[in-house]
Amino acid sequence: MRVTSLDEICGTHQGDYKMTTKILSKHIGVIAVGSGLIGASVYLLMIYVTLAHIEAVSGHVPFDMRPFGYGPTEAATLLEALGVEGRAYYLSHQIALDTLYPAMLTLTLIATICWFGQRMPNRNLVRFGVAISIGIALFDYVENLGIAAMIWSWPEVSVPLVFATSTATILKSAFTTVAVLLTLLVGVSWTRLSEADVRP
């Protein structure tokens, strides 16, 4: 099985997949905008509907909205406060939506970074941004699995499971911050290079 490299993802590979990546490069802007709109819609739905409902029912901040993590006591407090219906809602509504969101966010960040990074002579920043963006989705899905496992195992609270899920939440938040900053940095570099091209 052939493993796709980061260069191929951004359409800069010069091997067998040159034609495919060239087509991808031409449409990368459309992909960035399209996935961005879907991702933003899902995000707003989570913030103003599912996560808001979870917080209203429990009186506590949901796991997803705790960038600095949580311990076993905090996890148990939230799970107990949710009640049977609240825990079921977390699984059927929030986790379901958060299955789509990480993929859309990661696709948006990768497409945007690759779009802006096409003019950059040094591809290292672009590669790093793509890798970090992929990390966001991985940790977000690990977080989702951990939250689901905590709900399924309630009223038992596994300390290792809580710490593993909390670590995934922290890393997801950190990677998201870094990826957004890198996207802005690549965008600024793209703007400067574009301005340099139009100067006489």
Name each region found by the language model.
Residues 21-93, 155:
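Interfacial loop at the N-terminal end of multi-pass membrane proteins
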